[in-house]
Design a protein with these regions (language model features):
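Short, ordered, surface-exposed loop/turn motifs in non-cytosolic proteins
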Residues: 61-64, 133-136, 141-155
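Conserved catalytic scaffold of divalent metal-dependent phosphoesterases
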Residues: 141, 210-218, 231-234, 322-401, ...
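Short, acidic Ser/Thr/Gly-rich low-complexity loop/linker segments typical of extracellular
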Residues: 147, 152-170
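Ser/Thr/Pro-rich low-complexity tracts
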Residues: 22-125
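Extended active-site neighborhood of metal-dependent phosphoesterases/phosphodiesterases
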Residues: 184-201, 275-378, 404, 408-423, ...
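C-terminal motif of bacterial Sec signal peptides marking the signal peptidase cleavage site
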Residues: 15-18
């Protein structure tokens, strides 16, 4: 409780908006003394009453007017029910809704602001609040309370009873409470943001009520989830224009599938922390941009390393802006028969307030503790989709896949997932790779990792430098993943922005692909050997040759896919899996980044060697090929490759 006393402060002129006859009267502040405890928040029923405790016998008089003013400037007069030297009771108007209100007391033409209060307005609960409870409430739909909804403050986890009521013994560390949206229900939206959480209003030791109202929906067993990889919006390199191409593609895809339920999950790095301050483009600007361009789609969000405030000096403060604007950094929800978990796997406790941004890829012990409690309510037969920003594993030329997280932390995380069928979805790399349960790195667990390509591809650089080419460091086109869910069955597909779902691979006639130092005439002749050698890796990979080899980039490849290549005579050519640099990305980005007279160090965002490539050798330079790729779900894509096949950036622009 906070004590408020009325004494002379200032002269206030205020037009009172009210349903009463006092509306429109100008009131002048003057000194009159009333003392009572004004709580931070109160729980009231609609049209109900509340008792305020008076101090030192200084209570209001019967002719005083008690006023609540909403954030929209609407004032409500609360009639006195009774007044004594110990307390007074007011009736809260039925029109008042949950929210913050300024509290005024008016005596004759004198009016004084007392302070601010938060009203939690709801139905009366059949509940005795436990002694240690600090957060409680009801989860309900139009049909009444919903039993079995999991509720958490990020530390403690509880479940609603048969009336939809929950209680939490919360220290209120995170300042919010959230529900794990139950199957068959949806929450309301604020733009693209699903409102599955409530921000806490009172101090840690003060009990407060937070209710959740859900909408019952049907047909949730069959739906799509759009996995949206790194966006990196910063209002530079024409990113906002390119982003509108993505949202147009997204909206066109949704329009082409009318009547199908769709949700989306952003995989992190919606923003670019380096430009929050220098370019005045941060989380609010991201939300403003996407809310203008995408309507009627709930996007659950994941925090990425570029969504933290680099000016902070610890993890808690670094993620506070994200929490304030978007959502909790870890939570869970259910859609149909699938349980989704969103994890924060970026640890910023080593931040020093500078752009050094020293972070670690790890899941905090607090999250692991919460996850164990969350999964205690999830049957082992329920498939899990776990979403986090940074990759858990990473391909290695020598070792297949390796753990790319804190090793001890990862072991603890995987141990919690034992017995479940788990699909982990990540971003961060801006490239595409897939880990399947057959990989030794999963240690025999039924775990998949889908590292999903970026919406921004090469941080928006490829289309900026070479208009019409929007690809990432491994040659994956900028785009997003489409997951089809039917009951407990999941299917996935990667879709490139600006083209159909049938664009799943790219072929190169290596007789036509070659790079040399003549491609970078502006690169300084005295550039360091380190920088020059970085460029020479592309020259050495693709010298001028006539070996009649064809390179095929299948960016969403996994071991369950098949590749078949036949020549025009019907001969089967045996593909060889290779690590390679994508030639189109070399030409569209790397060559142009190295071809600079001001070059002094190795440029960022250049082509990386990656494993989802295959080579075949044709009989001669003119032999045409039929290339057929098939995924594990039976989707088949074919190219009739006419050779020689031209290699220029213009030839590879999407038509």
């Amino acid at each position: 409780m906070v004590k408020y006393a009325l004494w002379w402060l200032s002269l206030i002129f205020l037009t009172l908006v009210s349903c009463s006859s006092d509306a429109g009267v100008e009131s002048v502040a003057d000194e009159f003394s009333v003392k009572f405890d004004l709580p931070q928040m109160v729980d009231v029923t609609k049209g109900g009453e509340y008792v305020f405790m008076v101090e030192n016998g200084e209570s209001p008089v019967a002719s005083d007017v008690f006023i609540l003013e909403s954030g929209e400037g609407i004032s409500y007069i609360c009639p006195f029910v009774n007044i004594s030297n110990e307390s007074f009771t007011v009736r809260i108007p039925a029109e008042c809704e949950t929210g913050y209100y300024k509290v005024y007391l008016k005596r004759d033409d004198r009016k004084r602001q007392i302070g601010q209060i938060y009203l939690s307005v709801g139905e009366k609960l059949n509940l005795t609040v436990d002694a240690c409870t600090t957060v409680y409430g009801r989860v309900a739909s139009e049909e009444g309370g919903i039993k079995g909804v999991v509720v958490s403050d990020g530390v403690e986890v509880a479940e609603t009873d048969e009336d939809g009521i929950y209680q939490l013994k919360s220290d209120k560390k995170w300042g919010y409470v959230f529900i794990s949206i139950p199957s068959g229900y949806e929450v309301s939206s604020d733009g693209v943001l699903p409102q599955f959480f409530q921000r806490l209003k009172a101090n840690a030791g003060v009990p407060e009520r937070q209710d959740f109202t859900l909408t019952k929906v049907s047909g949730q067993d069959t739906y799509k989830v759009l996995m949206l990889g790194d966006m990196h919006l910063a209002n530079r390199t024409a990113d906002l224009s390119q982003f509108s191409d993505f949202t147009a593609d997204l909206n066109n895809y949704r329009s082409a599938h009318p009547g199908e339920k769709m949700y989306a999950i952003a995989l992190g790095d919606m923003t670019w922390d380096l430009y929050w301050y220098s370019n005045n483009f941060a989380i609010p600007e991201y939300l403003n941009t996407i809310n203008k361009q995408v309507k009627d789609l709930q996007i659950f969000h994941t925090i990425g390393n570029h969504d933290y405030d680099y000016k902070a000096v610890n993890d808690f403060d670094a993620e506070s802006k994200y929490i304030n604007y978007i959502a909790p950094v870890y939570y869970s929800f259910n859609i149909g028969k699938i349980h989704y978990v969103v994890i924060d796997d970026i640890d910023c406790d080593s931040y020093d307030g500078t752009t050094s941004r020293n972070y670690e890829k790890r899941i905090s012990p607090e999250q692991l503790s919460w996850l164990a409690k969350d999964l205690a309510y999830v049957d082992k037969s329920t498939p899990l989709v776990v979403v986090m920003h940074a990759q858990l594993f990473y391909p290695s030329e020598s070792d297949g896949f390796k753990v790319d997280h804190d090793v001890t932390n990862t072991a603890q995380f995987l141990n919690l997932l034992k017995g479940y069928k788990v699909n982990i979805v990540t971003g961060h790399t801006h490239m595409n790779f897939n880990v399947t349960p057959e990989s030794p790195v999963t240690q025999g667990q039924e775990i998949y990792e889908h590292n999903t390509g970026a919406i921004c591809a090469s941080w928006w650089w490829s289309d900026y430098l070479t208009p019409g080419i929007h690809i990432s460091l491994d040659g994956t086109p900028g785009g997003y993943a489409i997951w089809d869910v039917s009951g407990t069955k999941l299917q996935w597909l990667y879709k490139a922005t600006g083209t159909s779902e049938d664009y799943q691979f790219r072929s190169y006639d290596l007789n036509q692909v070659h790079f040399s130092l003549t491609d970078v005439p502006q690169m300084p002749s005295n550039i360091s050997a380190t920088v020059k050698n970085k460029y020479m890796q592309y020259v050495n990979a693709y010298p001028e040759n006539s070996d009649n080899e064809v390179l095929i980039n299948i960016w969403n490849w996994n071991p369950a896919w098949t590749l078949t290549v036949t020549d025009e005579k019907g001969n089967n050519l045996v593909p060889e899996a290779v690590w390679a640099y994508d030639p189109l990305h070399v030409a569209a980005v790397s060559v142009k980044r190295f071809n600079s007279a001001s070059l002094s160090s190795t440029p960022n965002f250049i082509t990386e060697k990656f494993p989802h490539f295959f080579k075949v050798k044709a009989g001669d330079a003119d032999t045409d090929l039929t290339i057929t790729v098939k995924d594990e779900f039976g989707h088949t894509w074919t190219e009739e490759m006419q050779r020689p096949k031209e290699f220029t950036t213009d030839a590879y622009k999407l038509k």
